[in-house]
């Protein structure tokens, strides 16, 4: 997956969590080492996110502090994404299912290095009971309706998922301005 798309979808998930008042827990196995730091867009879009430092464990679920942070949310349904689909997303998702959690894995917000790796991982996580989704499905399911005060913020979320959607948003915004300002359309002018 191209890095800009991964970053944008991770940012969209973080913003969705913020709009829905959902807890966000982030972690990295060795952020100062070869795996690098977290994608900064995550905490930028979810300033309430809790970061849990790990001591090198590859599977986040093998870190007691991470598991405790998840349990402390009181939630039994998890939405999971990770930098590498077959590792960062799959390992903790499968482990959480084994402990009784309902887990939704956001595949297009998780990176991969090959189509084959993604297909193998999808088969593995589905067999384990993980439910695969994409970012747009997560957004739509949690948003539920456009008839809400924060609809413009949701529209911004969709521009992160579908960059071309920005054109529709701009068109809609302009149409709203025309109505609000009692302007005549060009087709209505004499």
Q: What do these predicted ranges mean?
A:
Residues 1-25:
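A short alpha/beta connector and helix-capping loop motif
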Residues 29-33:
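Short active-site-proximal "capping" loops at secondary-structure junctions
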Residues 20, 34-190:
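Active-site-adjacent betaalpha module
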């Amino acid at each position: 997956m191209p890095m800009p798309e991964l970053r944008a979808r991770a940012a969209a998930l973080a913003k969705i969590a913020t709009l829905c008042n959902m807890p966000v827990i982030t972690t990295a196995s060795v952020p100062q080492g070869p795996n690098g730091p977290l994608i900064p867009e995550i905490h930028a879009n979810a300033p309430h996110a809790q970061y849990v430092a790990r001591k090198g464990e590859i599977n986040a679920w093998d870190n007691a502090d991470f598991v405790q942070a998840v349990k402390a949310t009181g939630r039994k349904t998890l939405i999971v994404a990770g930098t590498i689909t077959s590792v960062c997303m799959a390992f903790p998702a499968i482990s959480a299912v084994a402990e009784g959690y309902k887990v939704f894995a956001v595949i297009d917000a998780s990176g991969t290095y090959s189509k084959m790796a993604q297909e193998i991982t999808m088969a593995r996580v589905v067999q384990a009971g993980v439910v695969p989704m994409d970012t747009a499905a997560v957004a739509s399911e949690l948003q539920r309706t456009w008839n809400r005060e924060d609809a413009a913020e949701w529209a911004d979320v969709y521009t992160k998922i579908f960059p071309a959607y920005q054109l529709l948003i701009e068109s809609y915004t302009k149409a709203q301005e025309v109505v609000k300002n009692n302007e005549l359309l060009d087709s209505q002018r004499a």
